[in-house]
Each structure stands twice: as C-alpha cells, then as structure tokens.
Amino acid sequence: MQTLSIQHGTLVTMDQYRRVLGDSWVHVQDGRIVALGVHAESVPPPADRVIDARGKVVLPGFINAHTHVNQILLRGGPSHGRQLYDWLFNVLYPGQKAMRPEDVAVAVRLYCAEAVRSGITTINDNADSAIYPGNIEAAMAVYGEVGVRVVYARMFFDRMDGRIQGYVDALKARSPQVELCSIMEETAVAKDRITALSDQYHGTAGGRISVWPAPAITPAVTVEGMRWAQAFARDRAVMWTLHMAESDHDERLHWMSPAEYMECYGLLDERLQVAHCVYFDRKDVRLLHRHNVKVASQVVSNAYLGSGVAPVPEMVERGMAVGIGTDDGNCNDSVNMIGDMKFMAHIHRAVHRDADVLTPEKILEMATIDGARSLGMDHEIGSIETGKRADLILLDLRHPQTTPHHHLAATIVFQAYGNEVDTVLIDGNVVMENRRLSFLPPERELAFLEEAQSRATAILQRANMVANPAWRSL
C-alpha cells in the first residue's frame, strides 16, 4: 500500500458543488483519492510521502479530449496556409506514410513531454497512422513508460466517395512532388485489427490505456463499419468516436448534415463522441443532445485551418458534455491546454460579441470534468473527489504573468501560459515535479530534442515536402 499526501494547497475540486478549498489536503492511496479536507478542520492521515503545496493551486489533471499524437513531428512549417483537405492530402497523409516506428516512438515522447508540462494527464489519441506496421507497438511502449492516461482511438477508413476525387486531384496539383497516399482498409480487415488491438492493449498499463474504435468521417466509412463500431463500443463497455462536420464537404456529399445522416441509420447514441462540429446548425445540436452524444471541440485547429467556429455555447447551454481537444500537433502547433482554453474563451466572445458567453469557470470545467464526461470517464477522473483516480496537477501562480491574481478560474484561463504547472500526478505517480519530467530527465532532454528535430527533417525529406518556403507577406 503506497500513500501520498498533498498538503496546504488551494483545491479547485470540480466536484458537483464546484468547491474551492483553501489550505487543504488530499490523501492518495494506491493511485486513488481516499480522503481530502481543510487543515483547519481535519488532520491528514500519515503518508509515505508528503508534497508541500503552499502557494500552489491543486486541480484535476487537464483532459485532452481529441488529439492526434504522431503528427507533432510534422509541425513547424509545411502545414501553414492550407485548409483542411489540402492539409490532409499534401501534408498529413504523406507525412504519416514517411514515418517509421522509431519516429513514432520519438513523437509520442515529445508529445507527452509538452502535454504533461502544460498539465495534461489524459489524452484521446485518434490514431490515424495505426495502419502502418510497427506504429502501434512503438506508441504503446512509450505510453506505458511515460505513465499518461491514454484513449487509443484506432481510426479506420473503408470507403471514399468518388465525387470528391476531382477536388483531391486539384489540391494535389498544388504539391505535385508529394506522393498521393491511401489509408483505406477493407471493412473486415479493420474490424479484425481493432478487435486484436483491443484484446492486446485495452486495460493495460495499470488500466491507463483504453482502446476505442474510431471510424474517421461519415463520407469515408461505410454504414456497416459505423454500425460495427457502435456495437463494439456497446459490447466492450467503451466509447467510439468520429470526426463530424469539420468541413462543409460532409453535408454536400450526404445531401443532409452528418448528424442527420447518422440519425437516419440509428448511429447516434450515448457512447459516441464526435469531434469538431463546425458546420452545425440548431437542428444538429438538438439531435446530438437528444441522443446524449458527447463532443470534443478543437477550437484552435479549426481556426488554424480556416474551417470555422463550432457552436459550443449552444451545446453548453443544453448541458451537453463538451471537452477541449488540441487536435493534431501540426494544425495547432502546440500541445498546451491552457493556451487552448484562452483561445476558446476569446474566439467565442468575438464571434458572439458577448463578453460573458463562456465564463472562465465553464472553460475550466471543459478542460477537466466536462472533458472527462466527453470521454465517458467522469466516474474515474475530472474532479478531486474520494474514490477517483489521483490525476492531479499543481500550479504555482507566483509568476509575473499571474500576478496579481484574485479570481482563480479567470487567472488560469486568461493570465496563465502553461509554465505555471509545477507538479503532475497520474494514478498517484509523480510524472513531473518542479517541472522535471520523470520520463525525460534534464540531462537527456537536449539530446532528445535534437534527435526529434533530425527525425522530423528526415520525414519531410522522404515525403518531398517543403517545410521552409520563401518569405511571403501576402
């Protein structure tokens, strides 16, 4: 039995009462929160280890509700100035094909280093390069070592609507030197591979790794494939996820919105999490709410690619579970939940011309308890409550940018940079303390970053991508 106690911190619990407890303690035993209290009212039990949190804020770990991890090695140049399908076919797919398993291992470690340093403890990795041999094994090995909580949502594509081919051909003409790649699979093959993946990895790493099926988008997956994913999630008591209405092409191809299309086939349910939802109207929001569908909003990515802004306030007003996802590392160019929270608040204030449209408290909820709800994991993570997993972060607000501070939620959302995250626990294990990562010691970090840079350059060269074009002011 291992015990750990965090003492004399300010707890932002995110429990149902949203209690904020000053000068408080949290007691952790075997990876779970077993007790908490205020020092003036109770005495913490003895512990094997005590972390002094004086001057710090203790929060549930941030939850990255939708992301693509490997793509972090494709950032830094080739993605800029491209909209979604241009980016997909001229950068993402060729770049993924040019990656080797050793590159994937480096990408996952780099991603986790940046994520943990910004307070992210859970990631929903939509793995769209899992089709390539060795990539899954490379990723899982690093995830197990690093200690993050991971949903490995294995994506699949089992059809492509022929009407989009002319559009793709035109986009390819912009980068003719880049090879056109296909990640299509036969439906039966995708089913077998995802089933085997779940059998091997779901529940491993002390329960930190989960496996979901992830049909990519409605125009690229058969109804058979989506029905199978829905049944798989139900039978194995997991969730399933897909990208929805990230562009307006989905509606053009279906002659109705993707939400309407899925409802026609009975595919909207409480185990489904949909990402993006940019091209949504009130009917689409109503359909998702009616079926208790969960949502992940990638606000920075949608802006980066010029896609638009999802109607998040309308979803929040209905009480829907909406989490925040940083999306691909190369269509956000950072893995910083605090930065994405700030952008979420600002873009909706601007679009709605309403300075109170999403409160800082709600934004913080979206990064914690609502993110957990969007993953169907709110019974285990997302708040500081007895019985839940000890995924906790300590923020030190004694920085110039967070001084002065009075309103904690507003300070975290609008003033913080991310470097205020001092200590991170996942399952009660300390994976970062004093900003030192357990899985990337300081003496190894520079050499590792140089290796990541070298591998990224080699990937772009193999894919014939131009990463540093001529200076362009217009």
Swiss-Prot record:
Is the NADP keyword given for this protein?
Answer: no
What binding details are noted for the cofactor? Binds 1 Fe(2+) ion per subunit.
Q: Name one GO cellular component term.
A: cytoplasm
Q: How is its activity regulated?
A: Melamine catalysis is highly inhibited in the presence of aminoatrazine.
Q: Which UniProt keywords apply?
A: Cytoplasm, Hydrolase, Iron, Metal-binding
Q: What is its main location?
A: cytoplasm
State where the protein is found.
Cytoplasm
InterPro entries, A to Z? Amidohydro-rel (IPR006680), Metal-dep_hydrolase_composite (IPR011059), Metal_Hydrolase (IPR032466), MTA/SAH_deaminase (IPR050287)
Note the superkingdom of the native organism: Bacteria
Q: Site annotated as Major determinant of melamine specificity: where?
A: L84, D328, C331
Report the SUPFAM superfamilies cross-referenced here: Composite domain of metallo-dependent hydrolases, Metallo-dependent hydrolases
Q: Which family does it belong to?
A: Belongs to the metallo-dependent hydrolases superfamily. ATZ/TRZ family.
Functionally, this protein is described as follows: Displaces two of the three amino groups from melamine, producing ammeline and ammelide as sequential products. Can also catalyze deamination of other s-triazines such as CAAT (2-chloro-4,6-diamino-s-triazine) and aminoatrazine. Has no activity with ammelide, atrazine, halo-triazine substrates or with pyrimidines.
Question: Other notes on this protein?
Answer: TriA and atrazine chlorohydrolase (AtzA) from Pseudomonas sp. strain ADP are 98% identical but catalyze distinct biochemical reactions. Enzymes differ by only 9 amino acids. These 9 amino acid differences between TriA and AtzA represent a short evolutionary pathway connecting enzymes catalyzing physiologically relevant deamination and dehalogenation reactions, respectively. Potential evolutionary trajectories between AtzA and TriA have been constructed, and catalytic activities of the intermediates along those trajectories have been characterized.
What name is this protein filed under? Melamine deaminase
Native source organism of the sequence: Paracidovorax citrulli (Acidovorax citrulli)
